[in-house]
Swiss-Prot record:
One of its GO terms (cellular component) is extracellular space. One of its GO terms (molecular function) is toxin activity. The gene is stn. Keywords: Disulfide bond, Enterotoxin, Secreted, Signal, Toxin, Virulence. It comes from Vibrio cholerae. It is found in: Secreted. Residues 19-61 form a propeptide. This is Heat-stable enterotoxin ST. Belongs to the heat-stable enterotoxin family. InterPro entries: Heat-stable_enterotox_CS, Heat-stable_enterotox_STa. It comes from the Bacteria.
Amino acid sequence: MRNLFIALMLLFSSIAFSQTVENNKKTVQQPQQIESKVNIKKLSENEECPFIKQVDENGNLIDCCEICCNPACFGCLN
């Protein structure tokens, strides 16, 4: 009888623990990643780019506005 009681306690405690983990997993949010993607999308759709034309390492003229308006883009500097 004692072994049955211990087995039931272990079973219910593991179920309760796994349910707690599942509940906590649902509350984790990642708004920063979503916000970051939206900002990059808005920047890339911006037609009034503050970037000036740049020259690459081969001497070719690069219009950064044609590439993107995101300041993190390679070769695009103010």
